[in-house]
Amino acid sequence: MTPGQWLFQAQQLHPETLALQGPQALTHAQLFDESLRLAQLLKRQGIRQQQLMAVQLDSSWQLALLLYAALQLGVRFLPLDPGMDNARRQKLLSLVGCDYLITEQSAVEPGLQVITLSQLIDQSVSANVNFHAEPLEAENIQLLIATSGTTGDPKGVMLTAANLMASAAASEDRLGLAAGDSWLACLPLFHIGGLSILLRCLAVGARVLLQEGFDAKGVWEQIAKGAVTHISLVPAMLDRLLRQAGDQPPHAALRVVLIGGGPLSGLLAERAHAAGWPLCVSYGMSETASQFATDASPDAGLLPGLVGLPLQGYEVAIAADGRIRVRGEAVMAGYANPEGESGKGLEQGWFETGDLGHLDAQGRLTVTGRADDLLVSGGKNIHPVEVEGRLMRCPGISSVGVTGREDPVWGMVLVALYTGALTPEALKGWVTENLPTHLRPRDYIQIDQLPLNQMGKLSRGALKNRLLQADKGDG
């Protein structure tokens, strides 16, 4: 059953249970009707099956409704970061062959039609009983996701309906999602980590509790009253949530705290476990339709980089150079390209993640970091994630990022930029006592805030620029 058919199935099996809760609360029957109504409006604007519709909106609620409408109409869907600048947007939309763009305000985009949100909202149209849904077939491209890199040319990841079906089934198998559960969604919906929540819940008839951005107080209130069974967070969000909760245990209804989007420090994992938070540490990306490995064991997160066994339908291998490769039913059809060819970015079905890692005797995957981030100092390969994890165990350190500075003797020396009350001198003294020589940074720079992207993940390019500025005396 394809994602477009999930809407019909959910309203048949669970018509009166809540499907989507945000500014409004919609049952599965109401969501089916509303998505069908929006699909009619989109069709009146000229949008047809298998055309590509990009959506760039501030409102997660409106974006979610348009996704469901796209499923009904059989339209390919591309959610865009509302902060994406015009030049980058034009380049991406040209690359992927976009037909329509839905935005808050009118815009000029060569070669495609722009529809403002008001044009859809202003049309008060009831669902036409003669209008029939036109869901895509399993092999059709259903979703495109813009890669989240902040540098370089944007790419569009092509995911078929079959990819999304396999991903939802694999997640359900590992995490135990079922009808009646409630997944709090506070990640951006233009990222696969956020958007996949909508699809997983739709597949089984669960509820999505949708928040506009991450508000630790609001999230904790929902968890504390037992309204949440599942939640997806990045490590920075988990830290803020634990602080908001005062390191109290969550309500017993919460069964899964899915962590992804970057490495989870052992110290943060220990805090969460001590307070009784049910962590599941995951690893995945847009190209794999979200998570493809997840550690759901009772001690998840306590071993650095361990992300557990691959999910059903995925095969993981380690290349000779240590890079992680993955293939399977949910791995993308390829990167969008003007020729419309599938398989771009894949090698005989394998996708190379660009991350380094290893598999243990049990088949569990450990991720050590990005291959491109590897630093070579004095002939030794050092990954900054390992150093950062150790530095975070120092009392008085709130956050830390490690980067490299070119050196005529060592090739590269490590530099730590950190936040916290500890002085650089005191931190250096702690490091001397606790870290082996090759993992010790040469310098320590205290800053007000680490550069993070919208997912709360350390931006290593921006961190490098901060170091260059500091070396020039610019702060």
Where are the regions a protein language model picked out?
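Conserved AMP-binding/adenylation subdomain of ANL enzymes
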Residues: 165-182, 190-230, 244
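AMP-binding/adenylate-forming catalytic core of the ANL superfamily
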Residues: 328, 334, 356-439
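AMP-binding/adenylate-forming catalytic domain of the ANL superfamily
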Residues: 436-458
